[in-house]
Amino acid sequence: MDLLTVDKSKCLKCGICVECCPSCILSMTEEGPTCEFDRGCMACGHCVAICPVGALENKYTPLDKQRPVTKPMLDEETAYEFMRMRRSVRNFKPVMPSEEDLTKLLNITRYAPTAGNSQGMYYLVIRDAERIKAIADAVANWMEEEIEAGSPNKRYYMTVLRAYRDRGQDIIARKAPCLVFALARRLNNTGVSNAEQCWAYAELFAPTIGLGTTIA
């Protein structure tokens, strides 16, 4: 199957699909848009979404799989207040999030921007209290090693360790009932920045389903 299928009876040959393609692999001909290098497609779907008459099909983002926006868009004031209300949570209830809510939370991260639409994120969910404590202990041990190695962050690490070990305050895992790790393949050199974008989406979405989050 070709990458692009063009409905010639609809196509205006306006060229907007060519202009918006981030991979610069489309060109306009007398027959309509054509792809010069199929393997260069990042499957972002911009060419399909931007077409004003729905004349373009992309095998990676077919029109019949698109989901129309059925609810009204946020107005400026509502969107501003929604973004402004974002806050990290560092005091958690001893209540385990349901699998359904965790699935909703992780599903929303699929829509976060990633470099070159690379996506490729994986998630590890930890719900066992003993394992969470072991992870926090491992982080504390790592901080101790960093202090001994003369890390430029050693003052911060010392503050954390005093609270964690001397006062018994769980300043690392915050007694959270659940930890979620974002993972990417070793060769994915944008994995860290992709994860940060995904967590930003998750953090904004979490309060709408009654969850609190903090990013570490």
Question: What name fits each language-model region?
Answer:
Residues 118-119, 173-177, 208-209:
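Short gly/pro-enriched beta-turn/loop segments at secondary-structure junctions
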Residues 19, 68-104:
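Specificity-determining recognition surfaces
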Residues 12, 86, 105, 109, ...:
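Small-aliphatic-rich amphipathic alpha-helix that forms the alpha element of a beta-alpha
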Residues 3, 16-32, 46-63:
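Iron-sulfur cluster-binding cysteine motifs and their immediate structural context
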Residues 111, 115-122, 128-131:
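N-terminal, charged amphipathic alpha-helical interaction modules
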Residues 124-195:
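Glycine/small-residue-rich phosphate/adenosyl-binding loop
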Residues 1-20, 24-27, 73, 77, ...:
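Ferredoxin-type iron-sulfur electron-transfer modules and their immediate structural context
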Residues 35-50, 66-84:
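Short microdomains enriched in Cys/His and/or Lys/Arg
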